[in-house]
Amino acid sequence: VPHTRSSLLWGVAAAGLYGLSAAPGVVWADSAKLTLYALHAYLPSLNPGDHAGWVLLAQGWLGLTWFWSPTYSLHLLSAVAGAVVVAGVHRLLLRWGDPLESAHGAAAVLLVAHPLWWAAAVAESYTPALALVVVGALLLSRGTTPAVGMSGVCAGLAVAAHAFAAVLVLPLAPTGRPRTWLPFAAGLVVGSAPMWLAWIANPPDPLTGFSAGGGGSWSWVVRAFLSPDRWVRGVALVAGAMGFALGPIAIIAIVRRIRRGGFSRHPNPILAAVSLSALAALLTVYSPYRLHLMVSFVVVGAVLLAPPAASLRWCIAHGVLQVALYGAAAGGAHLVGRESLGVRQLPGRDNATYFLLPPKSWEHSAEAYARRLLAAVPENAVVLADFNPGAVLRLVQELEGVRPDVTIIPTAVDDALATPDPSGVLAGRIGEARAGGRPVVLADSWPPYYRVEELRRLGYSFAPCGPGLLVERAPDR
């Protein structure tokens, strides 16, 4: 009972921290996309980027929290799931027979780990997927047939929520007699239904309007996000992200744990180590834009495998140092003029604060951008956007019921960039809309995407339109 109480206390602490860190409204990119998917009940889908298992969870959660706005409610889903991860890992290590100090150390590391805290503050698939893995492992440790079957359901739903959850599920899966693994396998099939049912029905993506949830979507993901040429830079980025997530105190403690006592009492530590190494290697060639969140699977897996033994003083020191580290990193980036962090700065977004500080309670840039643009565009306009602002614009338009006269094409720029002649394709889109008598607005002016200078050379001219650009004149054709 005292051990159960201590696990609950860690969960309450995590729920408080993550709940206070939750974003109040719409957030850029995948968060906006996933919220739109939840509102449209977009499933089933085999596309790993559609996170169909998360959509199913979100549907149930929205039904329970009908009194909150959908955006805030789904941010809180991540916060609650993050708290389940922290408390669940603490309880799981005790269930495996590890010392109480190791469980405390693991919970302390996870509580303030950058990727987990960050993902727990916004509507994302990471913490729900991790929570399902941990809950499934706790059920599996009970050993009864119903519990093993439900463990399989949790594992299947975790993989359907985020494909990388398979890295943690595989080493935890039962082996041996069919009596042990058959209920788990049956549950796995049931839990992963939000994915495999797409072989029977494949609804259109509510963001793009295309049916992109079939089996061919996996090959698209490989082409779009994996590049072996990135591996040298990728090794440095993965090592840096892991170091930033764990911090110096935790890294020293984990290394000391491995040297002195080896691994935890994980049911399959060798396979777990191999799986985590494989994921880390994959992340070195993966698109770096989501790396700060993707490493959450490696962090949780590492802590389950080698939890550091910790006193209360150690836990407090680690937490204080990590918070100071995140603040110093964001402040330092501003001091040296590198607040962009070398990536695209979306309108109103400060990259150093946005990416390096996990709390999102002050994040309003996405909503402010969408409202400014939708207020400025002419009547009956067509807005050509790329995914980042496009998902936000579409979500705000739908949630607030504003500007139904405006047509937002949220991935028009992405589609153009996938062709040999992006500026020519964009020019064709502009010409098509203007031929129908409709004004055209570019959602942003970032040169690598919107090719404004190339379009000017083709005879187009532009005028400011809120945070976007209005196509003022087009060449005679």
Each model region followed by its residue ranges:
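Loop-to-helix entry region of an early transmembrane alpha helix in multi-pass inner-membrane enzymes
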Residues: A52, L56, W66-A87, H104, ...
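Extracytoplasmic catalytic/substrate-binding loops of multi-pass membrane glycan-assembly enzymes
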Residues: L20-T35, S45-G60, Y72, W362-S365
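Short acidic/glycine- and proline-prone juxtamembrane loop motifs at membrane-interface regions
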Residues: A29, W118-Y126
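Membrane-lumen/periplasm interface segments of specific transmembrane helices
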Residues: W181-R223
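Membrane-interface alpha helices of multi-pass inner-membrane proteins
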Residues: A15, A106-A108, V134, A147-H162, ...
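Signature aromatic-anchored transmembrane alpha helix within multi-pass, membrane-resident enzymes
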Residues: A185-V189, P307-L341
